[in-house]
Amino acid sequence: LSAQINSMTSPWYLHFMRYDPTASLKKIKCPVLALNGEKDIQVDADMNLTAIRQHISENGNKNVTIKVYPKLNHLFQTCEKGTLAEYGQLEETINPEVLKDMTEWIKKQQ
């Protein structure tokens, strides 16, 4: 419990919780690949990806690729619940489909 309290009161964590990325997103002009796991309990996929698409496209950037992966957690591992406790119990490091999609997206940008 003490370690959790310390991490949640650290300067980095407090800055991160207060940070609003809207202004930064509006400045992005390069191609963007935004991915989320459907079972990510740390970052809500719909809220996150909707905001990314909206704010990046406000500056005219239409090169935004968005994808939500069913049954994947924050670390892009196939999971049941998506909880932090489950991370260490999963054999998969990262789902192969995510790596494939990332590779294909990067190749298309060249």
Q: Where do the PLM segments sit?
A:
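Alpha/beta-hydrolase
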Residues: 1-23, 30
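Soluble non-cytosolic domains of exported or imported proteins
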Residues: 19, 43-46, 92-97
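Solvent-exposed, polar/charged alpha-helical surfaces in well-ordered, non-transmembrane soluble domains
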Residues: 23-26, 50-54, 96, 100, ...
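Loop/turn elements at helix/coil->beta-strand transitions in domains of secreted/extracellular proteins
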Residues: 29-31, 61-64
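Conserved alpha/beta-hydrolase "acid-adjacent" motif
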Residues: 41-51, 59
